[in-house]
Amino acid sequence: MSLSRRQFIQASGLAMCLGALPFAVQANKSQPTKLPLPPLLESRGGQPLFLAIQKARWSFNGQNKVQVWGINGHYLGPTIRVHRGDDVKLIYSNRLSEDVAMTVGGLLLPGTLMGGSTRLMSPGESWSPVIPINQPAATCWYHANTPNRTAQHVYAGLAGMCLVEDEDSRRLPLPKHYGVDDFPVILQDKRLDNFGVPQYDPPANQGFLGDTLIVNGVENPFVEVARGWVRLRLLNASNARRYQLQLSDGRPFYMIGTDQGLLPAPVAVQQLPLAPGERREVLVDMSKVENVSITAGESASVMDRLKGLFEPSTKLVSTTVLTLKASGLLPLVTDQLPNQLVGDNPQISSSIRSRQLTLGDYSQGINSSILNESRIDITSQQGAWERWIITTSVPQPFHIEGVRFKVISFNGNRPEPQDYGWKDTVWIDERAELLVNMMQPSYAHFPFMYYSQILEMVDRGVAGQLVVNPAGF
């Protein structure tokens, strides 16, 4: 193959640059870091849970500590654990210099308690909802939901995990010792400058994509685990990036839960997609291996990294999510993987209404309408079942507050096993059909939202408002 004069000059120039590059660019720039474990915050005896939204200092690369936002003095927030049947008081306090709104994605709450724009906190203000926990065990997440600023606030660090436990989750022989065999794994992508400071420039369209994979606030983490089953609660808290996860040794994950709770039975999944806002619970068998890594596709080449010195890159420098290292500790869960987890036999007692929604890009909104907070887009009834047929001109994740749904089909085909179970967030590429169950009431002044989970797109109005009239109304 012959090279033109221009190609030869370009190749020679790049080769000279590569020779002069620091090792940090030619190889993985980050050394393995122990996985940070968010503090566990658990309601006991009716005591309130305090969540101070404030500035903090944090190091993403294990070197420079930089100013970030977070909760209770940490980048990201503590892991909240609540129990079905409890009434839990959360006290959010805004210690920042701008307005902030918060919500808990996945918690099935009335519209009055959902948060968001109707519960905006000015600097120095607090919001103290008492939330009834009345749903099956699930992995949820709380995060900023500030009008027109959600993307920037979540990127800055206003997010954390919320775990719901119930009798089933306590009864089943699953790993459940937080930080020992049960770990939160929060994925984000960022763009860091030479000092480790996160850079954020809203893209002209679509959503923000960084070049550095961050897990629980650090690059390239590892965690030491006991031999046996390890439970990972995966959350994609990225603004827009979707991940395809797999184990480095080719073994499958055993998925046991999704957004709205445990699956009827474990499902072996070779590749695990994880869209923004989605949660997945998986088990990994560490009984016969020394270590294994979770990866998220191919990392950027040296050439890509070189280009990234001169212009922002959207390719991840490293795609290692987390490395599990087996220690000499005996497993806390010695049972075999259970064949059945929870029952799932919903009773549909009403006629099913169909709705058509078209998700556009940032300029088109939903059904050709940008969000208008004075307009209610959909009205339904608590307990109702509906069939939502959603089409997209741009592949994107979609979320509905206050409901749970099952995926009936993608583009006319049955969903893959990883999309079984009850969900509240789903990746849609062209067309999806959902069976939606209206679980909680909402009101004209406190409506639910449904929206693109690409955070920049919801900030631009790719969203709608849903009122669910109370049962018997």
Swiss-Prot record:
Transmembrane stretches, start-end: none
Entry keyword annotation includes Cell division: yes
GO terms for cellular component: cell division site; outer membrane-bounded periplasmic space
PROSITE patterns: TAT
Entry PTM: Predicted to be exported by the Tat system. The position of the signal peptide cleavage has not been experimentally proven.
InterPro entries: Cu-oxidase-like_N (IPR011707), Cu-oxidase_C (IPR011706), Cu-oxidase_fam (IPR045087), Cupredoxin (IPR008972), FtsP (IPR026589), TAT_signal (IPR006311)
Single annotated GO MF: oxidoreductase activity
Signal sequence bounds: 1-27
Subcellular localization, as worded in the UniProt entry: Periplasm
Keyword Signal among UniProt keywords: yes
One record GO biological process: FtsZ-dependent cytokinesis
Keyword annotations: Cell cycle, Cell division, Periplasm, Signal
Pfam families reported in the protein's UniProt record: Cu-oxidase_2, Cu-oxidase_3
Family recorded in the similarity comment: Belongs to the FtsP family.
Record function comment: Cell division protein that is required for growth during stress conditions. May be involved in protecting or stabilizing the divisomal assembly under conditions of stress.
Protein name, per record: Cell division protein FtsP
